[in-house]
Design a protein with these regions (language model features):
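Cleavable N-terminal export/targeting peptides
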Residues: 1-29
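Conserved active-site loop/cleft motifs that coordinate metal ions or position small ligands
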Residues: 149-154
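Gram-negative (and chloroplast) outer-membrane scaffold detector with strong preference
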Residues: 29-33, 38-46, 50-148, 177-179
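A short acidic/glycine-rich loop-to-helix N-cap element
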Residues: 159-166
Length: 179
């Protein structure tokens, strides 16, 4: 009797381990609500600033995330000034993770609107005394490790002010966490 009970317990434990081994190793392959938070730095001819983004959405297909987000960028945007701009992007994000493994490469696309809410606009050169708005696009590649992400990318922003508009390109390096 004790041997049969022991064998039943071993069988239950073995089936539990086998079924969990066949599950999703990558959170991107679990359908339903998903979100991520990421932080990183921008480089253009040296250090150009930092950013934080939060996005939420849905894993609509295994490996494919679609969502919306908002962020904060503190970036030297104007080449005519040493003052950093306080930029707020709102965006749509598409992200595809290639493998259902603990370690998986991915591609990431973001695009949307960006606004300049710099508190020091009065210190900007003439013609930049109003808050500007425009659009941005970011493409990146990286590696997921369980719920963490490490990536590099290219960030392009265009902001229009009352008298002029400015474009800016920067390299991004960041880390993220998926929830």
């Amino acid at each position: 009797m004790k041997l049969n009970l022991f064998l039943c317990c071993v069988a239950v434990l073995a089936s539990t381990m086998i079924s969990s081994a066949q599950g999703n190793n990558n959170p991107s392959f679990t359908r339903g609500f998903a979100g991520n938070v990421e932080a990183g730095v921008l480089f253009k001819d040296g250090f150009a600033g930092e950013y934080v983004n939060v996005s939420s959405g849905c894993n609509i297909l295994p490996g494919l995330f679609a969502g919306v987000g908002i962020g904060i960028k503190n970036q030297k945007f104007h080449s005519l000034s040493d003052v950093n701009s306080f930029l707020v992007p709102t965006f749509i994000q598409l992200r595809y993770s290639f493998l259902n493994k603990s370690i998986s490469p991915f591609i990431n696309l973001k695009g949307g609107l960006i606004s300049d809410y710099s508190p020091s606009l009065k210190d900007m050169p003439e013609g930049f005394r109003d808050s500007g708005c425009g659009h941005f696009f970011r493409v990146g590649i990286g590696v997921d490790y369980k719920r963490y992400s490490f990536y590099v990318g290219d960030d392009w922003s265009q902001v229009s002010y009352s008298t002029a508009s400015r474009n800016n390109y920067a390299w991004t390096f960041g880390v993220g966490f998926k929830f």
